[in-house]
């Protein structure tokens, strides 16, 4: 069959049709007739992705034949439009590739009794606009900031790559790229060419999934899998990788579910193939374990070979019998020297091969790293020893040989790297603990033919789909975010929110995936699964934060870029100074009595300088601390979006609090309703509730709730036929018809009821619209405001009707948190759109002197900028949509976790628990973190500043002690481990409690 050519077409596009008349004219079935026949259904469906195919149809003799072809093709699911030309023997079909394949079109025509084949070179390709994708890769072999800079530089130079961020501590890289220019395999190849290991983890594509397979052993198994997937409707593309037993599938989630794909694979293969979703976080953990195991294997191999070398050099010469054996000749060489040469060669070029490969690739790309230093030091020692051995073999004069130096350096470096891998693994414990919260399985309830749930099926929790009804047993984890549809229980949400008290759950209660059901059986309907769950978003947020770079990291990046060249230069200077001084007799020969000459004496100093220098400690100082801190913050309900936010928060001078929902509980309650006209109170409440019912503001909800209870309190919730009514149904009976509703931010709402204008809002709203407020109402309003209550004024047909008093209780911890901030040297500010009297009354209760009232949402950002003018660092704490401009404008935005998605998106911190204590925790944690980072930098710098001169022999004239190169290598290995361990001390962080918060002082 000819090669298929497809093209994407716009939803409403139609191919041109020839027209004419008479028997000679072409009989064309226009697409319009198909649209009419389908009642517009195809047109509506055409909004999705479409492709078109041109098919040659033979055997048609009349218009009845064209109708038969049209009918056969149209009957197939996924066909959008079809036009058949009798004279041209051609059919033009527009279809959804997710629901239908070209082979199905051919089959439909042939089943109708005609021959069909695809016409090549007739379809004009119209490629889709490719979106930018974000992919995550695990990158192995990075040891310092220079490695990170090297990988980032290579990635950013790739054609099609829009941006790249690489994190040393997590060994992860995130790449934003254009899939039409470059694919993930090419990105992996580029990273590997640079001397690092790379593996793809996950992509931002929502309709792509990676399945792991068991039972995929032979080519027959692969063919079976291909046949199964080809027959599935809804699959756009798949790629089977038999080597690693994985299949990557791009599918239409509206046409087919993930569970259906897995079931089809297992059923179609008669159970020979088992499919499971590859969890990228679990793969990351397994990669960590694999890296540690690989490093341990290299270390064991190196120890197995190096220990005999050490004994031959240090111990055996003192045992006469063994010494006599080692001094025996094997050709021109002593047996001991030959054994050391063989053993060390294996260590140098087999065990140490990774250093050579990494160093070569780094140099090839114009960068330098720790591997370059290790290779230089060990190679210099090895080459000298080989030359000395050969020189002694052919001249009879045997200079000292230092084979053990290169072997011991490699061994100690591997030991240090192994400890570093283990320590770095500890820094990601927070992510691992969050991943462990994800349940492995879920109990899916299945319906019978009558629609009743009669059967249970245990499935992989990753296969849960939106709308599934799941059974949650006591003591088991909630498998996905959802809503309780049956049952009551208490759920422990402390692992997500930090709240220790169990939360009661009943019908309509929201539940969070990963939380623990304590007692009672629940049936829940899943509404968010996979990457959309709260737990997945927290994991993603923490992981993103750990990948981000704090601005202070730029210092380490700069030092790393020049570190290795400087060290090599210092090593050469060290060699030349000692060698030239020895050449001219500037120091006595007794200093080099243990060596053959000043050349070897100087070379040992130079090698020690090369291998003792450690760029890794500098590179790990910031990312490991940030990684631990973000994990610790997540454990305490404080989610940090990046190292830059951590760095800014340590220097916060002002914390601005939004009033409603931040300082207050956000649970407004109507305390007073007073009418100042002849209107009945019930009618007044109905009027106000009708106007506010369309608003999402907390005060509006309080007003509607108050009116509902006023009218229905004590009345049985039943209708005339005795059936219980829902609250929504009863409320709809109460409310009046509203027209032209509009919410006025910072003022209130206005609408038309019975054709007359209704205003519900603050004093500004009614006075701006020319409504006169009587003196008695004004006095009543002032009394409300002086008692920290918000007054809501109501007018109907431009006449003042009445007002309502609303209070929003303060959070219990608000006053103590404000006092604690003052003790920390932070100035609290309250910002609100409420009137001045109410604002000042609330501020007085919590102890805030700086109040900004009657501020519109847009003006909140202006207040932030005004405080920033003198260079102050400003933090903003809020929860609503109207806070998002101020959150974005602030140096540090903190969104209350119960707030809106927009506010959370604009913030730098998310306070999951909706508790103001966490504002103090966020600032205190950032201060502790950067105190630790500064200590890490001090240690890393001090180590190199002190160690390099000592290795260069600065103390030798006074102590007569020369640092052996292998000992220098050990020092280098342990320096980076010590920095990681220093960062791990942040795991001991304990957040300030309300009982001790007042003891906090400015650091």
UniProtKB/Swiss-Prot annotation:
Alphabetical list of PROSITE patterns matching this protein: ATPASE_E1_E2, HMA_1, HMA_2
GO BP terms, alphabetized: copper ion homeostasis; response to toxic substance
Residues annotated for Cu cation 1 binding in this entry: 62, 65
Keyword Glycosyltransferase set for record: no
Sequence ranges assigned to domain HMA in this UniProt record: 51-117, 133-199, 207-273
Gene knockout outcome: No visible phenotype under normal growth conditions, but mutant plants exhibit increased sensitivity to elevated levels of zinc, copper, lead, and to a lesser extent cadmium.
SUPFAM superfamilies hit by this protein: Calcium ATPase, transduction domain A, Calcium ATPase, transmembrane domain M, HAD-like, HMA, heavy metal-associated domain
Family: Belongs to the cation transport ATPase (P-type) (TC 3.A.3) family. Type IB subfamily.
Protein name: Cation-transporting ATPase HMA5
Organism name: Oryza sativa subsp. japonica
């Amino acid at each position: 069959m000819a090669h298929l050519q497809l093209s994407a077409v716009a939803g409403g596009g139609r191919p041109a049709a020839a027209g004419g008349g008479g028997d000679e004219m072409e009989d064309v079935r226009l697409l319009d007739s198909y649209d009419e026949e389908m009642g517009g259904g195809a047109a509506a469906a055409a909004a999705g992705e479409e492709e078109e195919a041109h098919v040659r149809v033979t055997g048609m003799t009349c218009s009845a034949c064209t109708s038969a072809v049209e009918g056969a093709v149209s009957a197939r699911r996924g066909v959008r439009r079809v036009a058949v030309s009798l004279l041209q023997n051609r059919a033009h079909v527009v279809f959804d590739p997710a629901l239908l394949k070209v082979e199905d079109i051919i089959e439909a025509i042939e089943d109708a009794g005609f021959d069909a084949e695809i016409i090549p070179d007739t379809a004009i390709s119209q490629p889709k606009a490719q979106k930018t994708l974000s992919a995550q890769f695990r990158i192995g072999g990075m040891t310092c900031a220079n490695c990170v800079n090297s990988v980032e530089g290579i990635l950013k130079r790739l054609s099609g790559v829009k941006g790249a961020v690489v994190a040393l501590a997590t060994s992860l890289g995130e790449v934003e790229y254009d899939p039409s220019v470059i694919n993930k395999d090419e990105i992996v190849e580029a990273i590997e060419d640079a001397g690092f290991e790379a593996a793809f983890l996950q992509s931002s594509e929502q309709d792509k999934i990676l399945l792991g397979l068991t039972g995929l052993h032979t080519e027959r198994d692969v063919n079976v899998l291909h046949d199964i997937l080809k027959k599935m409707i809804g699959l756009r593309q798949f790629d089977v990788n038999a080597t690693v037993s994985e299949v990557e599938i791009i599918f239409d989630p509206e046409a087919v579910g993930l569970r259906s794909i897995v079931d089809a694979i297992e059923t179609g293969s008669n159970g020979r193939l088992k499919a499971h979703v590859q969890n990228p976080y679990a793969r990351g953990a397994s990669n960590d374990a694999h890296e540690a195991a690989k490093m341990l294997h290299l270390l064991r191999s190196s120890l197995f070979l190096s220990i005999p070398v050490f004994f031959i050099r240090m111990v055996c010469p003192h045992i006469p019998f063994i010494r006599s054996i080692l001094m025996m000749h094997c050709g021109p060489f002593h047996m001991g020297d030959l054994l050391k040469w063989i053993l060390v060669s294996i260590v140098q070029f087999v065990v140490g091969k990774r250093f050579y490969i990494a160093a070569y690739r780094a140099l090839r790309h114009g960068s330098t790293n720790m591997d370059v230093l290790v290779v230089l030091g060990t190679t210099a020692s090895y080459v000298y020893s080989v030359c000395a051995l050969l020189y002694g073999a052919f001249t009879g004069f045997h200079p000292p040989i230092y084979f053990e130096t290169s072997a011991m350096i490699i061994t100690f470096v591997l030991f240090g790297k192994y400890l570093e891998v283990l320590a770095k693994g500890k820094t990601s414990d927070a992510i691992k603990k969050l991943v462990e919260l994800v349940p492995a399985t879920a109990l899916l309830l299945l319906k019978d033919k009558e629609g009743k749930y009669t059967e249970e099926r245990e499935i992989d929790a990753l296969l849960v789909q939106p709308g599934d009804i799941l059974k949650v047993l006591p003591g088991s984890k909630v498998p996905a975010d959802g809503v309780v549809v049956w049952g009551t229980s208490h759920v422990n949400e402390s692992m997500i929110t930090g709240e220790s008290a169990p939360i009661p759950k009943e019908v309509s209660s929201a539940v969070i995936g990963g939380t623990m059901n304590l007692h009672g059986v629940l049936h829940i309907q899943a509404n968010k699964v996979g990457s959309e769950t709260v737990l997945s978003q927290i994991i993603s947020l923490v992981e993103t934060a750990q990948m981000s770079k704090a601005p202070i990291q730029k210092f380490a990046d700069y030092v790393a870029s020049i570190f290795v060249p400087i060290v090599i230069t210092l090593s050469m200077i060290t060699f030349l100074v000692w060698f030239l001084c020895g050449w001219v007799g500037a120091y006595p020969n007794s200093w080099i009595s243990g060596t053959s000459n000043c050349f070897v004496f100087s070379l040992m100093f130079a090698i020690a300088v090369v291998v003792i220098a450690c760029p890794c400690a500098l590179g790990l100082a910031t990312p490991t601390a940030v990684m631990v801190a973000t994990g610790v913050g997540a454990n305490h309900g404080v989610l940090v979006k990046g190292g830059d936010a951590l760095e800014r928060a340590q220097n916060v001078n002002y914390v601005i609090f939004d009033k409603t929902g931040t300082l207050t509980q956000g649970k407004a309650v109507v305390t007073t309703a007073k009418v100042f006209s002849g209107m009945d109170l019930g009618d007044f409440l109905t009027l106000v509730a009708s106007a506010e019912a369309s608003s999402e503001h907390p005060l509006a909800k309080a007003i509607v709730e108050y009116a509902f209870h006023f009218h229905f309190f004590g009345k049985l919730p039943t209708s005339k036929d005795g059936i219980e009514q829902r609250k929504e149904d009863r409320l709809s009976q109460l409310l009046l018809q509203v027209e032209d509703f509009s919410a006025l931010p910072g003022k209130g709402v206005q609408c038309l009821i019975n054709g007359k204008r209704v205003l519900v809002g603050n004093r500004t709203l009614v006075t701006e619209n020319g409504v006169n407020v009587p003196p008695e109402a004004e006095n009543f309003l002032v009394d409300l405001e002086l008692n920290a209550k918000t007054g809501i004024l109501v007018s109907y047909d431009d006449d003042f009707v009445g007002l309502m008093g609303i209070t929003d209780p303060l959070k219990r911890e608000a006053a103590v948190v404000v006092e604690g901030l003052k003790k920390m040297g932070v100035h609290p500010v309250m910002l609100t759109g409420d009137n001045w009297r109410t604002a000042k009354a609330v501020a007085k209760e919590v102890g805030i002197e700086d109040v900004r009232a009657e501020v519109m949402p847009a003006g909140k950002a202006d207040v932030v900028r005004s405080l920033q003018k003198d260079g102050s660092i400003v933090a903003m704490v809020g929860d609503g949509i109207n806070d998002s401009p101020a959150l974005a404008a602030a140096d540090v935005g903190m969104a209350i976790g119960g707030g809106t998605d927009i506010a959370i998106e604009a913030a730098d911190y998310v306070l999951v628990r909706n508790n103001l204590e966490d504002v103090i925790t966020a600032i205190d944690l950032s201060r502790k973190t950067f105190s630790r980072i500064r200590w890490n930098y001090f240690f890393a710098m001090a180590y190199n500043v002190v160690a390099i001169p000592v290795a260069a022999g600065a103390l030798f004239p006074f102590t007569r002690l020369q640092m052996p190169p292998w000992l220098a290598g050990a020092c280098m290995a342990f320096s980076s481990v010590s920095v990681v361990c220093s960062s791990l001390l942040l795991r001991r962080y304990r957040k300030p409690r309300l009982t001790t918060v007042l003891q906090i002082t400015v650091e």
